[in-house]
């Protein structure tokens, strides 16, 4: 009995050549719809599914291959006598290779098609054939990836197709149908408004193999979530080396801070080191913003990454090139500025799509077999309540907002001391709030903190932070409030003629 291959593909790249090679290997080809038409027109010896099933396609093509003459031919075990007797009794011909790729559900979704069009692009027969062939991988070769055509033909020609090869193809097949179903499930979750379903189907596809992970002894990879809404890591690389694991992590931190200021009339420049801000500056243009960012911490910025929410001009590029940086990311680059930055061969230059609010409603943290999920931290403050005798000036209120936008993106416990749209001192990742403040102040003793604003990601449990801030000349504090000892901090502010404003929103970040 001759071997048979069933071919039914949406992506017809390379399928004619593949089918012709199968013909040369004495495979009979069965096909459906447009695939049959393509193969026939290109000289492939092919028969229609109806020739096998003796039943026409019905329901506008919804039912083509859902038939015992198809699935029986795929699923029967060649080494089981009762199976062989059954297919012989019913005159079911074996199908030994199944090459299927599915209706482009994902592409239809991304194209913003109507609900009815999306539904019609849910493949039923394709996944069924793939799963049948993958289940019976010992007897049937399943092909879901056009990149596998050449290697499969070569193995068939040389009779070197091993059981391990078949198992790998089966694994790829089930991964493909699993991803496909997850995309459909995710679409329907959105349709019914179920943001946090009892069963969460997420699917990711490997985008990049990285040189290594966080450290050289760790492997590292980048996976992209299928159908992610407005991913923040959306950039075009214009120069420099390939991004590393740590580069990508730091870049994400940089873009999160840039997103905080996406609606600002001023330009923001942020410097990031180990995913934390080491300097942030606001300015009328890229040069002023970066200058303030750089002068905020001239030491820590070395070897960091810099993001700027505007187009980088020649003057800014020249200043950026004065120090070693891993990445420069901006909305765009003037031609002359780009050439200047490219003088540093290893500098990664990234052009960023304009940042929008994330449409992904939640953020995730993987905990070794479990997944923590929470709403995105999209709220800066729920109020601006002055709780002291002294009232904030307009300039102080502006710096308070600036400081809170910075500190909410730093690792807790976090403190940001700012003045005139520039960070003067930052303290983060400390196990006590007073240590975060001491760390910020003592590492920047050369700075003039007179009239500065202190922003805290969480409330003060004691009045020690206010007292220390006063000793350095800080005149205003913005914090969430909510401590049982708020009264102590308020009284300390009144004692020192300082301003304190409560926002009502805590910004822990771990």
UniProtKB/Swiss-Prot annotation:
Statement: the UniProt record of this protein carries the keyword Hydrolase: yes
Gene Ontology biological process terms, A to Z: 'de novo' IMP biosynthetic process
Record keywords: Hydrolase, Multifunctional enzyme, Purine biosynthesis, Transferase
Catalytic reaction(s) noted: (6R)-10-formyltetrahydrofolate + 5-amino-1-(5-phospho-beta-D-ribosyl)imidazole-4-carboxamide = 5-formamido-1-(5-phospho-D-ribosyl)imidazole-4-carboxamide + (6S)-5,6,7,8-tetrahydrofolate; IMP + H2O = 5-formamido-1-(5-phospho-D-ribosyl)imidazole-4-carboxamide
Gene Ontology MF terms: IMP cyclohydrolase activity; phosphoribosylaminoimidazolecarboxamide formyltransferase activity
PANTHER family linked: BIFUNCTIONAL PURINE BIOSYNTHESIS PROTEIN ATIC (PTHR11692:SF0), BIFUNCTIONAL PURINE BIOSYNTHESIS PROTEIN PURH (PTHR11692)
HAMAP family membership: PurH
Family stated for the protein in its record: Belongs to the PurH family.
The protein's name in its UniProt record: Bifunctional purine biosynthesis protein PurH
